[in-house]
Amino acid sequence: MISIDFINETDLKVKEWEDLAKQIINSGFKYLKLKNKINLSITFLDSEPAQKINQEYRNHSYIPDVTSFPIEMSPQEIKALGYQEIGDIFICIEEAERKSIKYDHSLKEEMGFLFTHGFLHLMGYDHETNEKDEEEMFFIQDEILKINKINYTIKFTEEDYKEIEEKDE
C-alpha cells in the first residue's frame, strides 16, 4: 500500500500529474516487489523556490526539474510505525515544461520520467555514484516507464552539463 501526500505550491492545476504520479509509483512499488507500506510526499514548486532548495541543500544554482530527499528508517522504526516513510520529491513543472520542449518529449513523458526518477532515488538508487549503479537505476527506470506506456529517451548532452556548470559558477 502506498500513501502519497501532494502539496501544490504553484498556481497550476496538478490533478493530472497527481494521477500520473500515483500510477507510476504504484507500478514502481510492484516492480520492486516492495513489502512494507510506504509513505512519501510530492511537492509541486515554481522555479524560484525549486532553485532555492537546490542551492541550499545541493549547492547548485540551477533550477532543477526534480529534487529528492530520501529518508532512511531502521526495521524497528518501520515496525513501530507500521509503514516506511521514504522521503520527499520536489517537482518544478515549469522546468519540466522547458525540458519537454528542449528534448522533444510530451509533458506527460517528462513528468512520468521525473516521478519515476525521483521515486527511485527515494528507494536508494543513485546514478551519480558509479557506472554500475547508474546502469541499474536507468534499467529499472526504463522498465517502470515501459509498464506505464511512457516512451522516454534521455537526451541530456555534454552541452547540458556545461550549461549547468556555468550556472553554478
UniProtKB/Swiss-Prot annotation:
**Record keywords:** Cytoplasm, Endonuclease, Hydrolase, Metal-binding, Nuclease, Ribosome biogenesis, rRNA processing, Zinc
Membrane-crossing ranges are: none
Q: Could you say which cofactors this protein requires?
A: Zn(2+)
Documented EC number(s) = 3.1.-.-
User: Which Gene3D superfamilies would you find in this protein's record?
Assistant: Metalloproteases ('zincins'), catalytic domain (3.40.390.30)
Q: Which domain of life is it from?
A: Bacteria
What family does this chain come from, according to its entry?
Belongs to the endoribonuclease YbeY family.
**What is the free-text note on the cofactor?**
Binds 1 zinc ion.
> PANTHER family attached here?
ENDORIBONUCLEASE YBEY, CHLOROPLASTIC
Q: Which GO MF terms does the UniProt record name?
A: metalloendopeptidase activity; RNA endonuclease activity; zinc ion binding
Query: Where's it found, cell-wise?
Result: Cytoplasm
Classification via PROSITE patterns: UPF0054
InterPro entries documented for this protein: MetalPrtase_cat_dom_sf_prd, YbeY, YbeY_CS
Organism (species): Mesoplasma florum (strain ATCC 33453 / NBRC 100688 / NCTC 11704 / L1) (Acholeplasma florum)
Briefly, what is this protein's role?
Answer: Single strand-specific metallo-endoribonuclease involved in late-stage 70S ribosome quality control and in maturation of the 3' terminus of the 16S rRNA.
Q: Summarize where Zn(2+) binds, as residue positions.
A: H117, H121, H127
Q: Name one GO cellular component term.
A: cytoplasm
- GO annotations under biological process? rRNA processing
User: Which EC class, in a word?
Assistant: hydrolase
What is this protein's record name? Endoribonuclease YbeY
